[in-house]
Each structure stands twice: as structure tokens, then as C-alpha cells.
Regions:
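Short, compositionally biased "basic patch" segments
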Residues: 1-40, 264-289
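Conserved P-loop NTPase motor core of helicases/translocases
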Residues: 2-32, 44-49, 68-73, 77-152, ...
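Conserved helicase motor core of SF1/SF2 NTP-dependent helicases
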Residues: 40, 44-49, 61-67, 73-81, ...
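Hydrophobic positions on the alpha1 helix immediately C-terminal to the Walker A/P-loop
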Residues: 54, 58
């Protein structure tokens, strides 16, 4: 079975796009007004809201305003993607990527003009660069050495960051911008004793945003009301994972199309998979239930089924 997607130049719902732009401008306005104060701004987004684009453009605006900015995310892959996105939108902006000592700058970043890999101390002495690092590296490299003279700390994927990491890095700047997908799974730990703290007022596995809002309930929270990734047929399902957050698809109904073409007859095993794919192509989503059975935490049968579904698609 092969797939053909139509509608790459999809028509947009201009009212939805305008509403999202207005929310993002309000976030930037709040952030600039609060810069330098002990304050924060939160941006809550559904999947596919363009939050990384918003973050990259916003740090460019902050630097253009003369503010020293530290940009962080939980994982190495995320911060490397942020470096690329920042350079795409701000090609002339110097970027200091603070990585592990003795590790070379990844090839796809080394080829970017204006991206350096200084030590934390060197990055601190430089006046121009935007500093980008993981939350852990930012806390270790700067606060351990008494550094961290930034005006604004920006954290992308903030709902994936746990409170413990946020506590360690929060001191690098007085003003924070936390942006993330509220539908993500909460932070977790593989340690058996991690549940000792669960439910406590200072649970280290709370989200960074959760602990911020509990301690500072007056923090402005802006909900980005758009998803560029989903079309209108899938949005009602996605909204179930975002209670209290209203958002709509940026593309108009029927602006996208998925046509599936079968190479030949399927089998009894493939029949439910084909039916689910046909339903998803027609309706924008599908729900497929496996036969009930007692399973372990790791369910190999489900993993095999997902693999077969992806292979068939």
C-alpha cells in the first residue's frame, strides 16, 4: 500500500491564524515589559502549534532589544534543533552552543555560520551570542561556576522539563519564558524510589510550568489557539488531551487529502489494519482496538502491530 498526500499548498483559515498571531504578540509584549524583573510568562500550545518557530523568532527579538538570553530545552536533540531553527530565522545572530567539554560540535551545526562552542566562562564574557544549552548543562556550566548573568531564560518543551531541573537552572536569569505542549506526558524517572515524592508539594517530577504556577499563581499564561499539524477532522480528538485549551486547525476543511492505493489483496491479519488506514484517510483519524489480554508493562504484541501498521502504510 502506498500513500499520496495532496494539498501541500493548503488553504488557511485566516481567522484562526490571526488569533494565534495575536496571542503570540501578547506573549512577546508581556515578556518585553517584564524583562529584568523577577517574573515569568508561560506559553501553552497544542501539538503542531509552531511553538519552536515562536521561540526562535522571540529570542531574535530579545537579542535585537539588547537583552542577554539563555535558551534551553530538556534534551540534546531538542537544543540542537533549536540551534538550527534560530539560525534559519536569525541568520546573522551569533549563537554560543554550550555542549559537553571535549566534544566536537555536531557536523550539522558546525556548518552553520556564526555557531560556536565556547566554554561557559568564554560564553559569559562574550557580549553578542545567544547561549543555547540543555537545562542540565546550563545549570551545571553556569551556576556551578557562579556565572549566569542573563536577562531572560527561555525554556522550550517546558512541560517535558521536570521541577528539579528547573530549580537548578532558574537562577541564571530573573525573567523566564516557558513554552511547551501541555498534552505531553508528565516527566518520569526510571528510579524505583522516585514515587516517594509523588503527590508531595515539592515533587521533583512536577513539570517546570506546574511548579512555577503553583508558587506564582499570577504568572500570565497564554494559550496558543492553533495547530498547523492537524486538519479540522482530527482536532476534536486532539482536544480531548488538552482540557480547558481551545484551539482550531490552521488549514480549512478538505484542504488536505490522503489517498491510499493497495498493491494487491490483503490477508486476514492485514484486514483490520487496512480498515483502520482507510478510515483514517477518509475521516482524518481512526481508532483500532486489539483483543483484550493480560500483558506486561512492555507489550511486544502491540509493538509488532504498530510496526505492521506503519509498514503497511
Amino acid at each position: 500500500m502506498s500513500a499520496v498526500a495532496a494539498g501541500s499548498g493548503a488553504r488557511l483559515d485566516e481567522s484562526v491564524v490571526a488569533a494565534a498571531d495575536a496571542v503570540q504578540e501578547a506573549m512577546r509584549r508581556d515578556l518585553l515589559q517584564l524583562a529584568g524583573q523577577q517574573a515569568a510568562v508561560v506559553g501553552a500550545a497544542p501539538a503542531g502549534a509552531g511553538k519552536s518557530h515562536f521561540v526562535a523568532s522571540t529570542v531574535g527579538l530579545l537579542r535585537a532589544s539588547g537583552l542577554r538570553v539563555a535558551l534551553a530545552a530538556p534534551t540534546n536533540d531538542q537544543v540542537q534543533s533549536l540551534v538550527q531553527r534560530v539560525k534559519e530565522l536569525n541568520p546573522d545572530l551569533p549563537v554560543a552552543f554550550v555542549h559537553g567539554q571535549g566534544r566536537d560540535l555536531p557536523g550539522h551545526l558546525a556548518s552553520l555560520t556564526g555557531v560556536t562552542q565556547p566554554s561557559a566562562a568564554d560564553a559569559q564574557r562574550q557580549q553578542d551570542p545567544l547561549v543555547i544549552a540543555t537545562i542540565d548543562k546550563l545549570a551545571d556550566a553556569f551556576l556551578r561556576n557562579g556565572l549566569g548573568d542573563f536577562d531572560v531564560l527561555v525554556i522550550d518543551e517546558a512541560y517535558q522539563a521536570d521541577a528539579a531541573r528547573y530549580y537548578t537552572a532558574a537562577g541564571v536569569a530573573p525573567t523566564h519564558l516557558l513554552v511547551g505542549d501541555t498534552g505531553q506526558l508528565d516527566p518520569f524517572s526510571p528510579l524505583d524510589d522516585a514515587t516517594y515524592w509523588r503527590g508531595g508539594p515539592e515533587d521533583p517530577l512536577q513539570t517546570a510550568v506546574g511548579v512555577l504556577l503553583r508558587n506564582h499563581p499570577g504568572t500570565p499564561v497564554h494559550q496558543i489557539p492553533v495547530t498547523w499539524r492537524l486538519d479540522p477532522r482530527a482536532v476534536p480528538v486532539a482536544r480531548c488531551f488538552y482540557p480547558g485549551h481551545s484551539f482550531s486547525a490552521a488549514v480549512l476543511p478538505e484542504a488536505r487529502e490522503l489517498r491510499l492505493m493497495r498493491p494487491g489483496p490483503g490477508s486476514q491479519v492485514l484486514a483490520p489494519i487496512d480498515a483502520a488506514l482507510d478510515e483514517a484517510a477518509a475521516s482524518g483519524w481512526a481508532h483500532l482496538t486489539l483483543p483484550g489480554a493480560p500483558v506486561l508493562r512492555a507489550d511486544p504484541a502491540t509493538a509488532v502491530f504498530i510496526r505492521e501498521l506503519a509498514h503497511r502504510l
